[in-house]
Amino acid sequence: VCAVSKQPVGIDIERIGAYQPNVAGRVCSDAEQKLLEQCEDPARLFYRLWTLKESYVKLTGTGISVPLSQITFSFLADGRVESNQNRVQFASFPFGDGYWLAVGEKMR
């Protein structure tokens, strides 16, 4: 994957594996955990959330020293990603067979 931007970018790609509720309990916000509980396919949603969080920490360079549960994502009906992180825009989508890709980019 290649990204070209005048602003910093963070990218993450993960293979969709088994849903890990114990990990989700540590890294997902309360709102995200509710989404996972209501979801028909929690594994896909978990890895979508995970790649978004990873793209953010790669973008900022903070690593996982930031509590990932404080970075919250939600999804609009048209698939766009919303976040509580100001001045960052995100995109997330299936990539290849069985993978999620997420990109975060600082806004000007």
Regions found by a protein language model. Name each.
Residues 1-108:
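Core catalytic alpha/beta fold that binds nucleotide/phospho-ligands
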